[in-house]
Amino acid sequence: MSSEEHKKKLLYGVHFLQFLDASGAEKKEELDTSTAILKKKKKPNSLIVTDAVNDDNSTISLSNNTMDTLGLFRGDTVTVRGKKRKETVLIVLADDDLDDGSARINRVVRHNLRVKHGDIITVHPCPDIKYAKRIAVLPIADTVEGLTGSLFDVYLAPYFRDGYRPVKQGDLFTVRGGMRQVEFKVVEVDPPEFGIVAPDTIIHSEGEPIQREDEENNLNEVGYDDIGGCRKQMAQIRELVELPLRHPQLFKSIGIKPPRGILMYGPPGTGKTLMARAVANETGAFFFLINGPEIMSKMAGESESNLRKAFEEAEKNSPAIIFIDEIDSIAPKREKTNGEVERRVVSQLLTLMDGMKARSNVVVMAATNRPNSIDPALRRFGRFDREVDIGIPDPTGRLEILSIHTKNMKLGEDVDLETIAAETHGYVGSDLASLCSEAAMQQIREKMDLIDLDEDTIDAEVLDSLGVTMENFRYALGVSNPSALREVAVVEVPNVRWEDIGGLEEVKRELIESVQYPVDHPEKFQKFGLSPSRGVLFYGPPGTGKTMLAKAVANECAANFISVKGPELLSMWFGESESNIRDIFDKARAAAPCVVFLDELDSIAKSRGGSVGDAGGASDRVVNQLLTEMDGMTSKKNVFVIGATNRPEQLDAALVRPGRLDTLVYVPLPDQASREGILKAQLRKTPVASDVDIEFIASKTHGFSGADLGFVTQRAVKLAIKESISAEIERQKQREAAGEDVKMEDEEEGEDPVPELTRAHFEEAMKTARRSVSDVEIRRYEAFAQSLKNSGGSSFFRFPSANEAADSGNTFGEAGNDDSLYD
């Protein structure tokens, strides 16, 4: 994919990985009005940045056609606007080789405008710029280290002499002279902001040099470009904040009041605070930050007074944004708080937001990750008008975020950000930032042998050789998991694959159809208008591989995997068990696509009504909660439930109906071919002698489950290890007896006494082998499986052929006519 296509994909949010929505239909890419504010309007003075041919800090080169269109002449002064409301003043030069619609500016000017190659800048004529009476400039400290003599005589005087250069307060410029390049910053211009340095302009250059760190801190202001993965939410926030602050007349002319406040909510780490800062930087508004807990005070009336001061300050400096972080700490529900202070603070906030003048150009933004614990009076129209859900990003959003975090990183050729984005389900922005830094740290660890920590400096070659590889990202993926799921005990993308599971071909095929097809072929489900299956129940004797199958499913679909052991959900506290189930499904929805594996399902989903005297019917309530969660899931995200039990007859009937756990899969004891497959899968990393007949072992282990066969192979391996260790000890003793030196570590190894598993090991292991499932139990499972088959619909159902249709016979006979029941 070319970089241009890649940009387009990022810009328009093309889905690299397509998942289904609740109805089973793929979400169509729609060009709707909700993101209209993000679209850049094409104007003649909007130009694309390209690299400059000359290295002058005060010029911008345009093509002749562009100059004619904008009514400019060579030598005119123009103001040029870049990103984050940065602007500077430059002199126009003509360039015949330049394309129309492009502008050449050098590295220093690009830095001042916060733009890079390919970004858009706007050019405006500025004929009324005055000559500066005086300017003050200071050098950047690291560029003047070791310099002696007058900076003014060597650098500044030749640079400004007869140049009539325009300058803007806050801009940097570089000057070459005397074998060095020195960087300066314009700290003051009189008259303020812009000015042209004429021969009679006084230039001050006395003072302490500016530290590079202080300058870098100013650069780290976040803008819209630093936010990825929430295009729609960004559009909502921009139209609610930018329009009232920059164009209040829009609302006046249409006759409505501009919005007062926005409440952003979502899981931690999705970028709520970052968004507020970006909006403030890009709009140029005064930004007043209130950290929720900071304004609370033990003195009576002080907390309310702190709030009032914040609002007064913002109104004085309008246009302004007041950002209240963690608003749930200062505005909890009044009926549920015991503290009088919190109640008064909530009331004060309500009156302040009501008392804000309609067009005072102040917008209140608030962020929380617990929107339901905020006082409801705050969430009505006229206070926090709009609530914006900043959720977990989809694969396209994750790719945007990864591109932002890796733009300053040195990446290896093999790094594929699209693959990483596809594999990081459930990761939010902060998780992806942590992933990138972990990958970089791993690269540094690999080069640690080249770095001498006692030295003050590190070789330039070592620094040059650092580059983050895909292998580093793979390592980072292995050690990190999404923050939304950290509270759930077992969340992993398991490392079990289909080939690790021997046999069970029929079961595997059914699972691939139920689980993998909806993820891999969403367009097929969309074509037939079908919503995919949401759950599978494995039942069968213990040790047949039910848990392993669930892990393989999650891995093959590249989904997150939450493993829940039935009994650990139950709690002695009233309502706690149901709450645990609710939390697990909430987490799964947040990290979708996700497989929730409920092991030992019979412990929490027994048939209702039979539990007499059981803690107020706790298990019945747990079943009810489970049923409602599984019904609610279909309307939510890609969450798939797999249940496993070896007592299927005890499960509640409502749980195994179509729409919940609708696919019932009997995982039987393996037949001979499956046993052979299991043994081969278990021994695939083990050296086995060529005369060991796996097929013969499989034929002699009738009635053994996968776990029983695992015991046989494990026992055989243990015997081989024991024999190997005994032989080594024996050899050592013989050496010592012969008076030989004890073998050194780097000496050649003798012949391995036990190089592989032999027949003898298996023969010995089979002596202790036993079946874990009795014939009686097997008959019980098979009877249950048979009863499910028999309770199915008519297996002889078929549509009548054309000539039969003429007879209009009833396919089901008289029994099919149920109308008489209701007569």
Curated annotation (Swiss-Prot):
It holds the Pfam family CDC48_N. Residues 743-754 have a biased composition (Acidic residues). Residues 729-742 have a biased composition (Basic and acidic residues). Keywords: ATP-binding, Cell cycle, Nucleotide-binding, Protein transport, Repeat, Stress response, Transport. InterPro entries: AAA+_ATPase, AAA_ATPase_CDC48, AAA_ATPase_domain, AAA_lid_3, Asp_de-COase-like_dom_sf, ATPase_AAA_core, ATPase_AAA_CS, Cdc48_dom2. The keyword Disulfide bond does not apply. It comes from the Eukaryota. GO terms for molecular function: ATP binding; ATP hydrolysis activity; polyubiquitin modification-dependent protein binding. Belongs to the AAA ATPase family. This is Cell division control protein 48.
